[in-house]
Design a protein with these regions (language model features):
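ABC ATPase NBD Q-loop/coupling interface
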Residues: 65-82
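Conserved ABC ATPase signature
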Residues: 142-146, 150
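Catalytic Walker B motif of ABC-type/P-loop ATPase nucleotide-binding domains
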Residues: 167-170
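Conserved ABC ATPase "signature" region
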Residues: 119-137
Length: 290
């Protein structure tokens, strides 16, 4: 099995040896397959953001290792720099980090730092703007003239323009309306499919993660406490409740229907799955009541 990213006994301690010492992540063994769409969930302060900042070398472990394609990302300064182009990280509310005079220049910032030619930079800006759902006419505007959703897309385009093998997003749809959230998720999927990219998404939106990811990792107090498919994770309603997390609403409705005697499987976690199961059950229930 090909793992593009892997951690080995990864630990990070903030302010070690002081009264403020805090173990953010502890002894994490974690791996992501090439092309996988991974969701990371957990309560606030569980270690999610600390983990993802290690995955592109932004933070250095207190102990342990992070590997990209089998090589320790801190094996040399040059490789650590390369990793930051290969593993793109979009922070929460990335629109607050826009700073250039035009949207074009903001998106071009990463490719320029990669020392690409002017023509290649232009090609990448236009391509990434397309993936992010930005019209060409917006590229010459100041980023501060854009709407909130457009700023978010411009910030994501700036990371996509580096064509990362791994795209990591921290709450990419936070604060957006439903249409804006759907658009961002579609944009991310378009990039993933076009470049066979690996996507890692941190989110509190359980409906979103249930619909889109291949696998979920659940963090609690700096440790991984659950790792599996969305169906596996969201069928453990009692465990999620104990961890202070809400399951997708469809999972909760399905559980109530099962309690009333309806034979729904435990892995119903999306509206589409619920519709399919209810259609299958309708003839049986009709025959039973005839």
């Amino acid at each position: 099995m090909d793992f593009i990213l892997k951690t080995e006994k990864l630990t990070h301690i903030y302010s070690p040896g002081t009264p403020f010492e805090h173990v953010a992540i502890n002894d994490i063994d974690f791996a992501v397959k090439e092309g996988e769409y991974l969701g990371i969930i957990g309560a606030t302060g569980s270690g999610k953001s600390t983990l993802i900042q290690h995955l592109n070398g932004l933070m250095k472990p207190t102990s342990g290792h992070v590997y990209l394609n089998g090589r320790d990302i801190h094996s040399s300064k040059g490789f650590t720099r390369d990793v930051r182009f290969k593993v793109g990280l979009v922070f929460q509310y990335p629109e607050y980090q826009l700073f250039e005079s035009t949207v074009f220049e903001d998106i071009a910032f990463g490719p320029k730092n990669m020392r690409l030619s002017e023509s290649e930079i232009r090609d990448r800006v236009l391509e990434s703007a397309g993936f992010a759902g930005l019209d060409d006419q917006l590229l010459q505007k100041s980023p501060f003239e854009l709407s909130g959703g457009e700023k978010r897309r411009a910030a994501i385009a700036g990371v996509i323009a580096m064509r990362p093998e791994v795209l990591i997003l921290d709450e990419p749809t936070a604060g957006l309306d439903p249409r804006g959230r759907d658009d961002i998720i579609k944009n991310i999927m378009s990039y993933k499919l076009a470049h066979n990219a690996t996507v890692i998404m941190v989110t509190h939106d359980m409906e979103e993660i249930a619909r889109n990811v291949d696998r979920i990792v659940l963090f609690q107090k700096g440790s991984i406490v659950m790792d599996g498919t969305p169906a596996h994770v969201f069928s453990n309603l009692e465990a999620l409740t104990q961890l202070g997390l809400a399951a997708p609403k469809v999972s909760l409705v399905a559980a109530k229907l099962r309690a009333l005697g309806l034979p729904l499987p435990n892995d119903v976690i999306t509206i589409k799955q619920m519709q399919q199961e209810l259609r299958l059950l309708a003839p049986r229930e009709g025959a039973r009541n005839a």
